[in-house]
Curated annotation (Swiss-Prot):
<feature type="binding site">
    <location>
        <position position="243"/>
    </location>
    <ligand>
        <name>L-glutamine</name>
    </ligand>
</feature>
<feature type="region of interest" description="CPSase">
    <location>
        <begin position="1"/>
        <end position="189"/>
    </location>
</feature>
<feature type="binding site">
    <location>
        <position position="241"/>
    </location>
    <ligand>
        <name>L-glutamine</name>
    </ligand>
</feature>
<feature type="active site">
    <location>
        <position position="353"/>
    </location>
</feature>
<dbReference type="GO" id="GO:0006541">
    <property type="term" value="P:glutamine metabolic process"/>
</dbReference>
<feature type="binding site">
    <location>
        <position position="270"/>
    </location>
    <ligand>
        <name>L-glutamine</name>
    </ligand>
</feature>
<feature type="domain" description="Glutamine amidotransferase type-1">
    <location>
        <begin position="193"/>
        <end position="379"/>
    </location>
</feature>
<dbReference type="InterPro" id="IPR017926">
    <property type="entry name" value="GATASE"/>
</dbReference>
<dbReference type="Pfam" id="PF00988">
    <property type="entry name" value="CPSase_sm_chain"/>
</dbReference>
<keyword id="KW-0055">Arginine biosynthesis</keyword>
<keyword id="KW-0547">Nucleotide-binding</keyword>
<dbReference type="GO" id="GO:0005524">
    <property type="term" value="F:ATP binding"/>
</dbReference>
<feature type="binding site">
    <location>
        <position position="314"/>
    </location>
    <ligand>
        <name>L-glutamine</name>
    </ligand>
</feature>
<dbReference type="InterPro" id="IPR006274">
    <property type="entry name" value="CarbamoylP_synth_ssu"/>
</dbReference>
<dbReference type="GO" id="GO:0005951">
    <property type="term" value="C:carbamoyl-phosphate synthase complex"/>
</dbReference>
<comment type="subunit">
    <text>Composed of two chains; the small (or glutamine) chain promotes the hydrolysis of glutamine to ammonia, which is used by the large (or ammonia) chain to synthesize carbamoyl phosphate. Tetramer of heterodimers (alpha,beta)4.</text>
</comment>
<dbReference type="InterPro" id="IPR029062">
    <property type="entry name" value="Class_I_gatase-like"/>
</dbReference>
Length: 379
């Protein structure tokens, strides 16, 4: 028999439904994601640390879960909110139902609530703190108190929390339908050595770099510039990640060193914001952020529109860009800055997720541009 669950927002709004995960209490910033597929990749994206994810598509869990689609070693979202959980997970790759997957990692979840109403609240009032309570003895007053106690993501440095604790090599390319996940490539197939800062890196980002000939050394978020330079990299990659970029002073300072050395730098998501801060721009907390796989972004250089995958609650402030930074991409939803390029250094970044997972690959050529900068650096 299904257990009950409730979601309480900091403004006092209460949603009652059924539990689809573990028993317990979870608190975080409640956000909504408009992706129709890719729920497992979303849950395991470290960028969702300290966030409760609401999926707007009504049927979630149809294809179950499997070990190959995880973007990290664990679920990083604080909780999951959906409209309907199908009774049967049907897919030839399925290994476990979504409900069992949540329970196995002690993640709370709630279903059978009005996710359209919840999304409208978040869109109109902005992202709110919330509390999911699942199991017996549900207490609305306690849930509301816990939601109000949560400090919010502003000023929170989560990159160093979710980052790897030890450096490691990554040489595995992308999954294919015919062969699944491939074996690690030989060094002879990977001519470019790239150091990737792990602020919460998704595996598919690393795979797409390997696809383009990069031998990766993935390092912890707080690795010094001196330690990275000792590895003699051909380029430095700044990964995605959760939380506020401004407290990540260690990463901002290291990036400034790489810029001074004219080493190619490519940033995604949090890495984009780190490059902006290192170059003298400022960042802002967004009202409800961008979370989804259907966001139109205009490439200002080529004059074309890309459909992109997005997941961020902070953004670089275009009004603060110094003269040596030019805007390269803008959101067609709200006009926010989506990409920048240094005019005096081989460095650029993109706010969205060109690796998708889930989502379209319209922005994948950004990886190719990074390789072009590396080739010029090595020439």
């Amino acid at each position: 028999m299904s257990k009950s669950a409730l979601l309480v927002l900091e403004d006092g709004t209460v949603f009652r439904g059924v539990s689809i995960g573990a028993d317990g209490i979870s608190v975080g910033e409640v956000v909504f994601n408009t992706s129709m597929t890719g729920y497992q990749e979303i849950l395991t994206d470290p960028s969702y640390s300290q966030q409760i994810v609401t999926l707007t598509y009504p049927h979630i869990g149809n294809t179950g879960t499997n070990s190959e689609d995880e973007e990290s070693t664990a679920i990083h979202a604080q909780g999951l909110v959906i409209r309907d959980l199908p009774l049967i997970a049907s897919n030839f790759r399925s290994e476990q139902s979504l409900s069992d997957y949540l329970k196995s990692q002690n993640i709370v979840g709630i279903a059978d609530i009005d996710t359209r109403k919840l999304t409208r609240i978040l869109r109109e009032k902005g992202a709110q703190n919330g509390c999911i309570m699942a199991g017996d003895n549900l207490d609305e007053a306690l849930a509301l108190a816990k939601a109000k106690e949560f400090p919010g993501l502003k000023g929170m440095d989560l990159a160093k929390v979710v980052s790897t604790k030890e450096a490691y090599a990554w040489k595995q390319g992308s999954w294919t339908l015919e062969g699944g996940l491939p074996e690690a490539k030989a060094d002879s197939e990977l001519p470019y050595h790239v150091v990737a800062y792990d602020f919460g890196a998704k595996r598919n980002i690393l795979r797409m770099l390997v696809d383009r000939g990069c031998r990766l050394t993935v390092v912890p978020a707080q690795t010094s510039a001196e330690d990275v330079l000792a590895l003699n990299p051909d380029g430095v990659f700044l990964s995605n990640g959760p939380g506020d970029p401004e407290p990540c002073t260690y990463a901002i300072e290291a990036t400034r060193v790489f810029l001074e050395k004219n080493i190619p730098v490519f940033g995604i998501c949090l890495g984009h914001q780190i490059l902006a801060l290192a170059s003298g721009a400022k960042t802002v907390k967004m009202k409800f952020g961008h979370h989804g796989a259907n966001h139109p972004v205009k490439d200002l250089d080529r004059g074309v529109v890309m459909i992109t995958s997005q997941n961020h609650g902070f953004a670089a402030d275009e009004a603060t860009l110094p003269d040596n930074l030019r805007a390269t991409h803008k959101s067609l939803f709200d006009g926010s800055l989506q990409g920048i390029h240094r005019t005096d250094k081989p460095a650029f970044s993109f706010q969205g997720h060109p690796e998708a997972s889930p989502g379209p690959h319209d922005a994948a050529p950004l990886f190719d541009h990074f390789i072009e900068l590396i080739k010029q650096f090595r020439a």
